[in-house]
Every structure is written in C-alpha cells, then in structure tokens.
Amino acid sequence: MKKILTIFFIFVSMAVYGSPEGKAYIGSFNALRLGESKKDYKELSNILILLDIIGLQEVSNREGVETLVDELEKNTNEKWDYHISPYPVGTKKYKEYYAYIWKKDKVNFIKPRGFYKDKGDKFIREPYGADFKIGEFDFTFVIIHAIYGKNKSVRIAEAMNLPKVYDYFQNLDEKENDIIIGGDFNLSVRSEGFSNLLNHEDKIINCISPAMKTTIGTKGYANQYDNIFISEIYTKEFTGRSGGIDTANGNYKKTRELISDHIPVFIEADTLKDDD
C-alpha cells in the first residue's frame, strides 16, 4: 500500500525548534557555495536548527562548514558536529565538497561510505554516502548535486543512472537496507529522467511533493529540483511526512544573496524502531 505523503511547509519565524520526541527530521540543502560566497550565518543557523541532520551540497571549503557549526552551537546551546567529503568533485572549472551537519545529542555518525564508484563517468559530481544512527534507526545517507546545463537532455541522462547509485550503496552492507538519497537534482521529479529510479524493484519513492517548488527566483519560488528518495520496502521508518522550510518569507532577492537560492527539504522518520 502506498504511503500518503503529508507535506508541511515550516515558516521559520513560527516554528518550534526541533523534531518531536521519537522522531527525526532528516534534511538536504544546497547551501550555495558555502564558505565562498557572502553568508548570513546567524540567519542560516536559525533555519537549519529546525532539522536534526542535514546533507549539504555546494560546500566550497571546510571553513564554511565550521563557521556554520559554530553559529549553530551559539544559537542552540547544543553541540553540533560535521563530516566533510575528503576531497571536492566536479570539473576543472568548478569543484565542491559534500558535507553533513548534525545535532550530537541526537545523531550518531557511524562511518563514511565514500564516493560512488562512477566507472562510466556518468555523474559530473559523484554522489557521496555515510552511515548514521538516530535512536534505533540506522541508515546510509547519500547526497548528490546533479549536473546543471542549458541542455536538459544532459540532466535527464544523468538522472537515468540514479538506480546504479542506489544499488551501489545498497550492496555495500547486506545488513543495512535503509538508503536515503537526497540532493539537488536540477530536475523536477516529474521528469522522465527519474523513471528508472521510481520503477526500481525496491519500490523507491520521492518524498518531496512535485508541487512544492524548492528553488528561489528573484520574485518567488521557481523550480522543484530538490528531493529525497527512499525505498518503500525497506525504510518503513519514514512517517509519510515531509516538507520544506520557507527561508525567504517574501524576501526572495535578499535570501538568494545571503542564504541560498534553494530551500532545505526534509523527511520525518520514526526513530523508535529499526526494521533492518
């Protein structure tokens, strides 16, 4: 039976910080050249404290992550930690790191899984994975920043290879079946590029509504590019609730300049049980 998604949009000024007891908010966020571009780290921390763990894309350097973690600790009086990929990936002209940040009292970092072995060079930036445990729920969290090009067919072609990414991380450990793939895919989930992934034998589903726009234009929200995918067979800890954080509150241009041109997206997971 298909899960019914409950989509909720968090407004930062009204939100209660943190997830309910026995639940966790697992998020993905394109941080727009974190560590390189001008950032309002205090406001960014006000946004991200709503989540328990966040997979970050577009990380320019370690210093940006450390500055963000420091600000989160000041803002919450809680300990935060991070993990950053050992090296950046991309092209000769532009490379970026992946990173994770999390609340130390709630999330346990188990180990890095490393980069997807992209033997056919199908991805401009190889996806990266790491293992975490929140309560009784352990999982592999894979993050990706897909190619963006004026030619949409290039983006579709890359997305068609996502099942290989899922299978790679799924097969690394026969005891760990919970694979969460989050990131900026630079395509709407309605695109044919996701047909292979969504027809996978493990019944992979998209957790973020196709109707929710996740990028920020100068005059409003624009595209549905950010998403989180799980297996409906294995990751029964997913409660069916997911959403995004309204980072702009109508201030689209300023948010693009000081925060990001994407919003964080997230899922809610039950942490009192583990079905592996």
What is each stretch, according to the model?
Residues 1-4, 184:
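Positively charged n-region of N-terminal signal peptides that target proteins for export
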Residues 4-14:
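Sec-dependent N-terminal signal peptides
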Residues 16-20:
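Boundary at the C-terminal end of the N-terminal hydrophobic targeting segment
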Residues 23-33, 111-113, 138-148:
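Active-site-proximal beta-strand elements of phosphoester/diester hydrolases
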Residues 24-31, 47-70, 101, 141, ...:
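Active-site beta-strand/loop signature of hydrolases that rely on acidic residues for catalysis
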Residues 28-39, 119, 147-154:
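Acidic/histidine-rich helix-loop elements
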Residues 60-137:
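Structured beta-strand-rich core segments of catalytic domains in phosphoester-bond hydrolases
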Residues 62, 168-177, 187-276:
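Metal-dependent phosphoester-hydrolase catalytic domains
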